[in-house]
Amino acid sequence: MSRRGTAEEKTAKSDPIYRNRLVNMLVNRILKHGKKSLAYQIIYRAVKKIQQKTETNPLSVLRQAIRGVTPDIAVKARRVGGSTHQVPIEIGSTQGKALAIRWLLGASRKRPGRNMALKLSSELVDAAKGSGDAIRKKEETHRMAEANRAFAHFR
């Protein structure tokens, strides 16, 4: 048994303007080369664009988008007796949110155009409506898990 104590679980900090943890998680995932101020600029511009497009509370749109993209179940490769099986596993809420944010950012990076704030806002609005690449990714993951349900006992 380990003699070291268990590590305390860190809670995500909230961002300075909206006091929202999801915004801060988004900022930390969009961050490149340590340029956090640029990441904040992109997020805040995207939030303003959402406000202009939908004329509703942009944070509720963000929450709705992340809730819509968050997967309940995923598949994990597990090697059993010389062959690799895709085993469906349940995902916790924190890990699910992290995956959702990663998928949303990936989908918005793939969108055509130059401005990341515009691409991100479009993807978030689409995800809140129930369409877009990130939603398709979630559905694909759920389909994979459903197809490999026979291997669930390998967990």
Swiss-Prot record:
GO molecular function: rRNA binding; structural constituent of ribosome
Keyword Plastid listed: yes
Keyword list, A-Z: Chloroplast, Plastid, Ribonucleoprotein, Ribosomal protein, RNA-binding, rRNA-binding
Record-level GO cellular component terms: chloroplast; small ribosomal subunit
Ribonucleoprotein in keyword set: yes
Gene Ontology BP, a term: translation
Localisation: Plastid, Chloroplast
InterPro entries: Ribosomal_uS7 (IPR000235), Ribosomal_uS7_bac/org-type (IPR005717), Ribosomal_uS7_CS (IPR020606), Ribosomal_uS7_dom (IPR023798), Ribosomal_uS7_dom_sf (IPR036823)
Pfam families documented for this protein: Ribosomal_S7
Range of residues in the leader sequence: none
HAMAP family: Ribosomal_uS7_B
Homology family: Belongs to the universal ribosomal protein uS7 family.
Function as written in the Swiss-Prot or TrEMBL entry: One of the primary rRNA binding proteins, it binds directly to 16S rRNA where it nucleates assembly of the head domain of the 30S subunit.
Subunit structure of this chain's protein: Part of the 30S ribosomal subunit.
Protein name as catalogued: Small ribosomal subunit protein uS7c
Name of the gene this protein is made from: rps7
